[in-house]
């Protein structure tokens, strides 16, 4: 439990988190306990801020500024200082003061995991025995790092040690759970037949119901992949051909049952179910899948008390609303003149139209999207293409559009509303509307070859 007070109000020693964010354009810093915001402070003219806290027990928090989130482990009477340059936040952030050691160790491990991502991808093509040798070697290095850290910091609390060990080793455990999904043997032998007997021995070292760690990203990401792998193994056990399980309803139904069998209650269970629901919605070709209502009904059976129930019920309703033949939902936009309009007002009922999305804040990917649109325009000259910017900088969007030959451009003024109604999880999404103003497809990736098949069938 955390109570935010002024330290001067009581004769007691305070816990302090202060910081300096050079070049920050965000006036505030928000402190979260788990997913709940508990306090907000404002940067002064010199870009300094301070949280004065009274806490009774150690807890993992995170703070947010300008869309950047960072974990911070705080113990009673800590006096932490965090530094970062807003221009390169992730690369420049560091801690000092009492309590800094564990927080800097977590930062180092997160940075190492990012750098090792390409290495893990190379390892995924190795046969199981060689793959395990590589991971075992990395595990020993990580364990040595952890033990050296504990040795030079003998006063670490048990919670701090747990965080250090998980931040160092769980990214490796997650990779072990991913491996069966991506490895393909030359003779297509099911992977569960050729894995070393001790391949999953690391699972014996894991506490699968650690409430202290349930919001810690390395721990949570491992749990997601653990559930995925259990479902993958069970679903493909008697199958002798490779299948893309992300497109299989049976795989997603297995996840529902597995989560229930392993986690009886709590936030971890609820969050894993939330992840499973979005994985189903965004990975399966749901508009072609007549069984989506079956999934929703089975999901609801296990999630009557889920803390995310209202959110997920709304998402499921939106999935149903986006089915082919329905009229698309309405949302607010502005045109290139800065005038407010609505999605319903810009539709042209006389022509098939693709609405594509891009972001002035994701320029590299947006350029690829515009190249794809140019290609589609050449292939389908009778189709209209309308771009909607979902970035956060209206001024930059307007400036960029005015300096290009892009036509039929609009800007979303409420991305949260738009993303919930259209179910946007990345900007590759497209929305295809027919000549009668009804949905043809609301779940097709703009780069998907299937999009061209859809247009060919409508234009033929």
Regions found by a protein language model. Name each.
Residues 341-373, 384-388:
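Short active-site neighborhood of thiol/selenol oxidoreductases, capturing the structured segment around
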Residues 1-16, 442, 459-460:
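Bacterial Sec-dependent N-terminal signal peptides
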Residues 432-460:
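Thiol-/selenol-based redox modules, centered on thioredoxin-like
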Residues 308-344, 412:
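N-terminal "domain-start" segment that seeds a small globular fold
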Residues 400-435:
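Short, internal strand/loop/helix patches
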Residues 7-163, 175-176:
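A non-transmembrane, solvent-exposed segment enriched in polar/low-complexity residues
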Residues 209-285, 294, 311:
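Long, charge-rich alpha-helical interaction segments
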Residues 166-236:
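Extended amphipathic alpha-helical segments with heptad-repeat/coiled-coil character used for oligomerization
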